[in-house]
Amino acid sequence: MKNLILLLIPFITFSQVDVPDKYWLDDSSFDSAISGTSAFGDDNTETIVVEFWAKFNEANCLAEWQEIKNAKYYRVDIAKAPKAKKEYRIRMAPTILILKNGSVEKAFKAGLDLLLPTDLAEIQETINEINQASNF
């Protein structure tokens, strides 16, 4: 059993960090990606999920990020976005913020154990609640 676990660790870790470049934000792209307006000045009412990530804790990131529905997903390497990290008071990674119109609606912050503080079902439920509330 121990050998099987050791054999699977590299595959699990790889799948968790296999996020295409277009989903990664740094300080130069963060504000425009999460702001409440688009490049054309239109209101952007899409819900946005931002995961603050750290290389030292990549095993605890959101592996199922592709399954998020009705929201845009971005990942931020805290080493490459110190301004965003400071602005949103990110102390531990992973931390997941759910934003609407540029404002944080919900935050899931890791504790001292550095474990992902939520799961996909809770994130999706929060997204659905935020989207429903904004339909009125």
Residue ranges: model-predicted function:
Residues I34-G36, I78-K83:
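N-terminal post-signal-peptidase region of extra-cytosolic proteins
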Residues F52-K55, D77-A79, G111:
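Active-site-proximal beta-strand/loop segments in catalytic clefts of secreted hydrolases
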Residues K55-E58, K80-K83, S103-E105:
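Solvent-exposed loop/turn segments at secondary-structure junctions
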Residues Y88-K100:
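Structural micro-motif
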Residues I98-F136:
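Non-catalytic, surface beta->alpha helical segment in thiol-disulfide oxidoreductase systems
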